[in-house]
């Protein structure tokens, strides 16, 4: 009797390999999302306790950008796995931003430079929404995220005790885990994820500055 495709051991093995290949990126997305939630919980907890003082410009923009992109993604029926991670990437900063208003000890005074960086980030977000080229849109999204990061980087560098380290450790690991899940390696697919990995890596250096023996402040 001739075996069909489902009875062919070689075909079964190929199907199994294809299934494993297809689910591996999903596993990375799940782990990455859980890391973000864990780090976000620790930061939110410390914010409510007054131990951590979020820079509201950074955290507002970190919440805004993913949620804006999520709205656009839903309008074109984007992949649900990627959308879940984007949703968490917007909700976690949003919750932290709101949490900073519940304890006066969590307040961090904003400077004109913070507002300037926020303005640049918002401008990049605006042009990102208007961009017709996917490549330009991704680069603008990366620029918006970088401009939003600068105020918190300076604060963390000068006053690392006002930050919760775990969120940056987890965010860095989360960004690294997503790299192998990139389906096609080109600038459009990888630029934003690489910028996230580099940004969180820089933040790790900032929050561990004193532990690394770096005394110079900005």
Regions found by a protein language model. Give the residues of each.
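N-terminal amphipathic/basic-hydrophobic helices that include classical n-h-c signal peptides
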Residues: 1-20
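Alpha-helical membrane-protein topology signature
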Residues: 16-218
């Amino acid at each position: 009797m001739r075996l069909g495709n489902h009875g062919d051991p070689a075909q079964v093995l190929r199907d199994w390999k294809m299934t494993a290949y297809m689910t591996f990126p999903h596993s990375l997305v799940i782990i990455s999302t859980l890391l973000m939630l864990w780090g976000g919980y620790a930061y939110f907890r410390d914010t409510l306790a007054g131990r951590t003082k979020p820079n509201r410009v950074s955290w507002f923009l970190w919440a805004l950008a993913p949620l804006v992109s999520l709205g656009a993604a839903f309008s074109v029926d984007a992949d649900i796995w990627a959308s879940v991670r984007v949703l968490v990437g917007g909700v976690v900063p949003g919750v932290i931003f709101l949490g900073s208003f519940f304890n006066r000890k969590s307040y961090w005074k904003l400077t004109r430079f913070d507002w300037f960086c926020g303005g640049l980030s918002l401008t990049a977000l605006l042009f990102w929404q208007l961009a017709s080229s996917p490549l330009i849109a991704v680069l603008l999204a990366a620029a918006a995220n970088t401009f939003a990061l600068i105020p918190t980087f300076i604060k963390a560098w000068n006053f690392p005790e006002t930050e919760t380290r775990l969120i940056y450790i987890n965010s860095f690991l989360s960004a690294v885990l997503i790299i192998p899940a990139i389906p096609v390696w080109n600038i459009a697919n990888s630029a934003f994820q690489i910028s996230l990995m580099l940004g969180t890596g820089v933040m790790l250096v900032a929050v561990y500055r004193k532990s690394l023996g770096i005394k110079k402040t900005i």
